[in-house]
């Protein structure tokens, strides 16, 4: 499943870049993130707890982050499992940060998410609704962090 979202943030690009580069902090802007820790190899491990329809999903996973801060490009590749329900997810999230003439910053997020096992059996409309809700929650929390 693919999702695209564009967020305009009333801050200069340098502020957004600085915030996004603090992965443990910015990860907590995602609704349901319970824990994030940086590993020795520069990747991150964490826990995401989210209710989708009748199921509460507890994903334990790893995220690899590639960034070209000068160009404003970020790529996050994640894989996670919920061993209790026998399912998992993998995703690639691309973010592009761009300074606007107004002085605001545009953050364009493209997400490609694959679900496996029992998670893959959930209906796409249900999953899409939850994914959009989480992206919107992230955007609200990111904006609120500058207030």
What residues fall within each predicted segment?
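Hydrophobic pocket/interface hotspot
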Residues: 16-20, 26, 65, 109, ...
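Short, highly charged C-terminal tails/helix-capping segments
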Residues: 140-147
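Hydrophobic/aromatic beta-strand elements that line small-molecule binding cavities or substrate pockets
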Residues: 5, 34, 60-67, 91-99
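Beta-strand/loop substructures that line and gate deep hydrophobic ligand-binding cavities in soluble
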Residues: 80-129
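Hydrophobic ligand-binding cavity/cleft-lining segments
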Residues: 1-49
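Short strand-connecting beta-turns/loops that link adjacent beta-strands
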Residues: 12, 41, 70-71, 100-103
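Intrinsic-disorder/low-complexity, polar/charged segments enriched in Ser/Thr/Lys/Arg/Asp/Glu/Gln
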Residues: 2-6, 43-45, 58-60, 73, ...
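Glycine-rich portal/gate segments that line the openings of hydrophobic small-molecule binding cavities
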Residues: 38-81
């Amino acid at each position: 499943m693919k999702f695209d979202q564009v967020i305009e943030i009333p801050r200069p690009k340098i502020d957004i870049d600085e915030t996004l580069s603090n992965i443990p902090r910015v990860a907590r802007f995602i609704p349901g993130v319970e824990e994030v820790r940086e590993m020795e190899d520069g990747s991150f491990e964490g826990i995401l707890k989210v209710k989708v329809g009748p199921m509460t999903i507890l994903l334990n996973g790893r995220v690899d982050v590639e960034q070209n801060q000068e160009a404003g490009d970020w790529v996050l590749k994640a894989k996670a499992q919920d061993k209790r329900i026998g399912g998992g997810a993998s995703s690639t999230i691309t973010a592009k940060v761009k300074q606007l003439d107004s002085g605001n910053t545009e953050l364009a997020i493209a997400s490609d998410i694959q679900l496996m096992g029992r998670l893959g059996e959930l209906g796409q409309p249900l999953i899409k609704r939850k994914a959009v809700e989480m992206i919107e929650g992230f955007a609200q929390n990111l904006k609120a962090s500058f207030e």
